[in-house]
Amino acid sequence: MTKGPVRLDVAVSYALPRAGLPSAVSFRKWVAAALKGRIREADLAVRVVDEKEGCSLNHHYRGKDYATNVLSFPAELPEGLPKGIKMPLLGDLVICAPVVAREAAEQGKLLAAHYAHLTVHGTLHLLGWDHEDDKEAEAMEQLEREILADLGIDDPYAGEH
């Protein structure tokens, strides 16, 4: 765990009308909560997309023919950087607004809480967390619960296990 303030640069872009979508300030708050105590500085991008772009990206990068709620693209540092130079570039998050809205409605969740959860979830992926097996999934879900609780958001996994 790192202590002290986080230097954070979150570029938020919207590929569809912003009405009803979280503000850039909200996305920054959620990313900062996920990074708190884990990393001192980070630059990342959040792009909110429609279903067509979400499906295209999921197909291209994961071979899946459907849009998913969040995609995480960790940054890869270029070869040949002098030793000791650490780039704060963390990566990119792509959040598919129609999928998030549909899931929130189907699961009876507040839309803003679901966006917060998926932003935290995606940011943790950028930090190297994963859920490929049950042990990893439980550890990641517990961390998500703690981060969201700090934000005043209920357990997103309540009733699932």
Curated annotation (Swiss-Prot):
Q: Where does Zn(2+) bind?
A: 121, 125, 131
Domain of life of the organism encoding this protein: Bacteria
One annotated GO molecular function is:
RNA endonuclease activity
Q: Where does it mainly reside? A: cytoplasm
EC top class, in one word?
Answer: hydrolase
Name the coenzymes or cofactors required.
Zn(2+)
**Swiss-Prot/TrEMBL keywords:** Cytoplasm, Endonuclease, Hydrolase, Metal-binding, Nuclease, Ribosome biogenesis, rRNA processing, Zinc
Does the UniProt entry include the keyword Methyltransferase? no
Q: Supply the InterPro entries for this chain.
A: MetalPrtase_cat_dom_sf_prd, YbeY, YbeY_CS
The free-text function statement in the UniProt record for this protein reads: Single strand-specific metallo-endoribonuclease involved in late-stage 70S ribosome quality control and in maturation of the 3' terminus of the 16S rRNA.
GO CC annotations on file: cytoplasm
The record's family statement is: Belongs to the endoribonuclease YbeY family.
The UniProt note on the cofactor reads as follows: Binds 1 zinc ion.
Q: Check the record and name the PANTHER family matching this protein.
A: ENDORIBONUCLEASE YBEY, CHLOROPLASTIC (PTHR46986:SF1)
Q: Where in the cell is it found?
A: Cytoplasm
Alphabetical GO biological process terms = rRNA processing
Q: What name goes with this protein? A: Endoribonuclease YbeY
